[in-house]
Amino acid sequence: MLQGNVICEEDILTSVCSNLNEIVMKTLHINANFDFYGLKSEGYYTIHNKNKSFEDKRIDLNMRLYFNEENENEFLYAYILWFSVNPKKIGIGSLIINEIIEVLKHLTNIEFIIIHPKDKEVKNFWIKNKFIEDHKLNSDKRININTRRILSYYI
């Protein structure tokens, strides 16, 4: 809904979810049914897909969009909590991640995306998709995540 001349965050989140549904339908032919939940007062909203699989295809995405504390009407960064796709090793995950990045670039004002890879194979996937080890983010007070081993992608 419009508030004055400003588009509110729920409209942005609805658009992000709609675009993610289109990406997954086009790529995997799954109605992923992306949705969001959370409260602005918590500092972030979580986006996730309710439908995870169809036949031998599967996608699971869970990410948060965090607000900028200096401007509470804008998102500062996205934190991908979980991303998994099947089939693997044929480029579908990379295709989907790159399209997600494009959606976030066009619909939000986020500065960067972060991920905390669970193991070396996962880390290599993200590095292949242009995420980098960035130690300066470890001391960035704007990030509400207490982890040291994060990869980032700057928008």
Task: Pin down the residues of each PLM region.
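Conserved acetyl-CoA-binding loop of GNAT-fold acetyltransferases
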Residues: 127-136
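Conserved beta-strand-loop-alpha-helix junction that forms the acyl-donor binding cleft
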Residues: 114-124, 139-143
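Conserved beta-hairpin
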Residues: 32-62
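Short, high-confidence coil segments that cap the C-terminus of an alpha-helix
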Residues: 108-110
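Conserved acetyl-CoA-binding loop-helix of GNAT-fold acetyltransferases
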Residues: 90-103
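Short amphipathic alpha-helix that is part of the acyltransferase structural core
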Residues: 1-40
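A conserved beta-strand-loop-helix scaffold within acyl/acetyltransferase catalytic domains
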Residues: 57-73
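Conserved acetyl-CoA binding element of GNAT-fold acetyltransferases
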Residues: 73-86
